[in-house]
Amino acid sequence: METLLGGLLAFGMAFAVVDACPKYCVCQNLSESLGTLCPSKGLLFVPPDIDRRTVELRLGGNFIIHISRQDFANMTGLVDLTLSRNTISHIQPFSFLDLESLRSLHLDSNRLPSLGEDTLRGLVNLQHLIVNNNQLGGIADEAFEDFLLTLEDLDLSYNNLHGLPWDSVRRMVNLHQLSLDHNLLDHIAEGTFADLQKLARLDLTSNRLQKLPPDPIFARSQASALTATPFAPPLSFSFGGNPLHCNCELLWLRRLERDDDLETCGSPGGLKGRYFWHVREEEFVCEPPLITQHTHKLLVLEGQAATLKCKAIGDPSPLIHWVAPDDRLVGNSSRTAVYDNGTLDIFITTSQDSGAFTCIAANAAGEATATVEVSIVQLPHLSNSTSRTAPPKSRLSDITGSSKTSRGGGGSGGGEPPKSPPERAVLVSEVTTTSALAKWSVSKSTPRVKMYQLQYNCSDDEVLIYRMIPASNKAFVVNNLVSGTGYDLCVLAMWDDTATTLTATNIVGCAQFFTKADYPQCQSMHSQILGGTMILVIGGIIVATLLVFIVILMVRYKVCNHEAPSKMAAAVSNVYSQTNGAQPPPPSSAPAGAPPQGPPKVVVRNELLDFTASLARASDSSSSSSLGSGEAAGLGRAPWRLPPSAPRPKPSLDRLMGAFASLDLKSQRKEELLDSRTPAGRGAGTSARGHHSDREPLLGPPAARARSLLPLPLEGKAKRSHSFDMGDFAAAAAGGVVPGGYSPPRRVSNIWTKRSLSVNGMLLPFEESDLVGARGTFGSSEWVMESTV
């Protein structure tokens, strides 16, 4: 019966254990330990129904994102926790607080960005911490505080760490393995590994280290180390893949005897890319520091901030220190700050800071110094003559305090009242909207003034403004004032008080003034209106000028059009038709029986065309023959020839037309001579010849002749038609003259006028002898150009 009850009890306990196992997990009951295995089950969170007596919990290969405090609460017996290969990005603080028995924690291959101070709190017995292949960018200084003395294996490889809590690492005295490879470490504090006597493996591969601190622990990494003990095993040290700066600071590492691990030099330029262990020891050199830039002199008002700069170069980069004038090393404090670039900031200067500050740049190769002179302008303090002592930390003299005290001091106590400042010691003139000129004067009994202090404030905001003025100046222009505002201005004189060895001050005088009012909007509007008015005026002037010019052109055009017809009409008033070669008789004829006068001589001046030499000779021969026939007919006159023409200017259209017109009138006079043989024609010819002169051009003055050749409107044209009379040409060709009368001329049709020939460039269909008659005497049947006057 007892055996049956024992079997039932064991079965019930096994059933209870199996029933407590989470879904998709495997629970193992191995003697006294209980294991819960849930690897790669696709879990999104830690199962809440895990047996709290679990000793080994494996949750790797899932999709857990968040770890909370309830996930591992009351698991005091948990020894091994695996959370590898998840997507954990956040661990709530104190989530492992109850895991006091945990020996191994695997958080590798997750997405942890950092480890806070309380992330790993409570793991007092932790020996193995594996946090590689995460996204760690920083680790808090107190993150490893609870297991510093128990930790044996720390793996932080394949992260983004720029630094570590090196003070915590220094205290991990039981650490056996430290993996820091494939990070962004660029500096290791000196003495970090001094107490890690049990360290057997140190991996610093693929970081940004340029140098390593000369620690004795690295001596155990030599290949010939025979002094290894269980408490001091040989060190496996790897530091390949770092840009080592091969100078004198790594000479100690080069002297170690160890196997070549393909470490290379990253700098300086002459050794870049060379294998570290192949570089000779004499090539590991350094350069002493050189100060390239520093502040020389600095003048600061007491109580204000001061900045001293000092820059130096060297190999390795030198460290810069500052020494105060009292030979005190300046460090970081509430009043001063020293930066890595060599700058010293003094936030509040005192009189003790006056003197020479020394900048010291030092490295492994030596040091260099530079001096900076600092002059402190001390704050003004009340003189002994004022019977007052200024507070130790008082600021510059206040207008409201100093001036009011001096005015009302006579009624307080029985002491002697202070002397009032002289009348009108300070004058303010040339006041504008934003500036004013202050002038002052001091008495001869005043001690030697070291400097003047000008104080002024605005009546609106009561902000006091100070200006320090050299003792040689007795005037100062105050700028940047507010328009239309009242100001209180005081001038103080400062000198050295020999009794107190401090700077004493006394009021020279005060004044009040108001700045002029300014109207920026109105002034802006006025300038805009003025600018627009100027544009309109200039535009109006341009338009008016154009209109006047157009009106002048139109008036001139109209006057020319009205004057031209009248002048042209006057020029053609004596024009008559010569269709038949006869001239109408004038109103009064010559008396009968008067001897016939010779034809008037027509003087062809420079208006004639300059024909070719051949045409001129032909014209002369034709003229001689024509005059010879005239003498045979009983004219009784000598042959009439044109005088030789003077050199003429270049012909133009005006001269061409004038020449043709002169030839036309000359032909008419020749016909009158021929007609004068008859009794009727002789009287008419005598009357006609009495109106012309051989000295006057037939077409009038040149000006009138030029105007007569201008084109006229169609309604004002005087038309005159001419034709060829071939009778005389035929007679001349036969060599005689028909006696006893005048044969009617024969008309020739379809003949081009001379103007048409001159315009169209065509030649007349006649012989050259017919054309040269224009230069000699003309018969009654000679052709005349058709012209429009």
Swiss-Prot record:
Subcellular location field: Membrane; Synapse; Postsynaptic cell membrane
Region feature (Disordered): 383-424, 577-602, 619-654, 668-702
Keyword annotations of the record: Cell membrane, Disulfide bond, Glycoprotein, Immunoglobulin domain, Leucine-rich repeat, Membrane, Postsynaptic cell membrane, Repeat, Signal, Synapse, Transmembrane, Transmembrane helix
Pfam name, any one: I-set
Domain LRRNT as annotated: residue spans: 21-52
Residues in Ig-like domain copies: 289-375
SMART domains: IG, IGc2, LRR_TYP, LRRCT
PTM per Swiss-Prot/TrEMBL: Glycosylated.
The protein's name in its UniProt record: Leucine-rich repeat and fibronectin type-III domain-containing protein 2
Organism: Macaca fascicularis
